[in-house]
Amino acid sequence: MISRLTGKLVEKNPPQIVIDVNGVGYEADVSMQTFYNLPPVGESVQLFTQLIIREDAHLLFGFATAEERKTFRQLIKVSGIGAKTALGILSAMTADELAQAVAEEDVKRLSSAPGIGKKTAERMVLELRGKLVAHAVTDGLFAAAPAADETEDIVGTLLALGYSEREAKAAVKGVPKGTDVGEGVRLALKNLLK
């Protein structure tokens, strides 16, 4: 599998780019979010990649961040969403915006992405709930990135117990920083039961 490419950007034709890595040109499709953040042709670039092998083609998709690639991987697991549709979704909204829309069950926002109707948007909410993490501060529902590994572990445990991402993050806000995971989960569960 090709996980990452570092080389010289030699072509930019939306949504495709070509990166020269030691004399070998790798063609990759990228989201428009990634495309707009690329350096000029001739400059050095690094992309996280996902290789998809089909009967008739080997397709390489590139992403500016590992988080965007992780979101892409979750999207292509959703029934009815292929690689090109997933790339279209990530072109229409950032990974954080997608995570927020899923957490808020915003079917209207999700169905505004190309190739996504109401039923597919509802399926996305159902299948992606709790699997995407927003790292952007928006309306106070999402914390920046977790301040400590313990916080992330506590949220992960609550998600595994069936709580929504919104509930888990809200419950963890009441847990003092530096609390170990076991105690943190206990306190977070107490917050949820209030």
Swiss-Prot record:
SMART domains from the UniProt entry: HhH1 (SM00278)
Region span, Domain II: 65-143
GO cellular component: cytoplasm; Holliday junction helicase complex; Holliday junction resolvase complex
Domain I as annotated region, ranges: 1-64
InterPro entries from the UniProt entry: DNA_helicase_Holl-junc_RuvA_I, Hlx-hairpin-Hlx_DNA-bd_motif, NA-bd_OB-fold, RuvA, RuvA_2-like, RuvA_C, RuvA_C_sf
Superkingdom to which the source organism belongs: Bacteria
Molecular-function GO terms, alphabetical: ATP binding; four-way junction DNA binding; four-way junction helicase activity
One of the GO BP terms on file: DNA recombination
Magnesium as UniProt keyword: no
Domain writeup: Has three domains with a flexible linker between the domains II and III and assumes an 'L' shape. Domain III is highly mobile and contacts RuvB.
NCBIfam families xref list: ruvA
Protein name listed in UniProt: Holliday junction branch migration complex subunit RuvA
Organism of this sequence: Neisseria meningitidis serogroup C / serotype 2a (strain ATCC 700532 / DSM 15464 / FAM18)
Underlying gene: ruvA
